[in-house]
Design a protein with these regions (language model features):
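Patatin-like phospholipase
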Residues: 1-219
Length: 219
């Protein structure tokens, strides 16, 4: 992904003007999977492992969980919706239903995993230990999502749900009931980061931390 970012530079304000999205979604969800680096749907569909994608339903404000192993076009629709960040990406549609990024309604889906029967969980975080999400200014919501009151409420409640879940994750981590992988050094990358050097540094740190955890688990 970093190599593709460096070559194609698919993040920028020009895309916000052209596509109403901070990223070049036409490149990401059309040219990339179809032409530049064709996605191997045959292998993906043949794999029996579960792959769950999360979106936020704009009508209900609730999380929707999808598994798709037959229809390539629907896979792209779901991934596009799951990647559509509020305010910087247009609403996407899955089966005709308006959707946005699943992180709005369920940023940390550990309860969903528990309900699915998974007793051993690995949680991969992109923030340092102790991070808590700030609330979103409700003034920003109506101009963007006037037609979706439940979505507005979900965005308002997001930080409370996120922070409560993070407290649970840290408690379970202290009790040795889940494995958490998170950055150790202070995060220097932004939400929509274009600086290749910063991205590589964060990637290298993640790779190093994962290797250290694997070494400890195999001792």
């Amino acid at each position: 992904n970093i190599d593709l970012m460096e070559e194609y530079n698919y993040v920028g304000l020009k895309y916000l003007l052209q596509q109403r999205c901070i990223m070049d979604f036409k490149l990401l969800f059309e040219k990339f999977p179809q032409q530049i680096c064709p996605y191997d749907y045959e292998t993906y569909f043949a794999n029996s492992d579960r792959f769950v994608m999360v979106t936020t339903n704009c009508l209900t404000g609730e999380a929707n969980y999808f598994e798709e192993k037959k229809n390539p076009e629907r896979v792209i629709d779901i991934v596009r919706a799951s990647s559509s960040l509020p305010f910087v990406a247009p609403i996407a549609y899955v089966d005709g239903i308006p959707m946005l990024d699943g992180g709005i309604a369920d940023s940390l889906p550990i309860e969903y995993a528990q309900k699915q029967g998974y007793k051993k969980q690995v949680v991969v975080l992109t923030r340092n230990k102790g991070y808590r999400k700030k609330e979103t200014n409700p003034i920003l919501l109506k101009p963007f999502y006037r037609k979706y009151p439940n979505l507005q409420q979900a965005i308002i409640n997001r930080n409370k749900i996120y922070n409560k879940t993070m407290e649970k994750i840290e408690r379970l981590e202290d009790e040795g009931k889940i494995l958490v992988i998170r950055p150790i050094n202070p995060i220097k990358v932004g939400r929509i980061e274009k600086n290749i050097t910063k991205l590589i540094e964060l990637y290298d740190e993640g790779f190093r931390i994962a290797n250290e955890i694997e070494f400890q688990m195999n001792r």
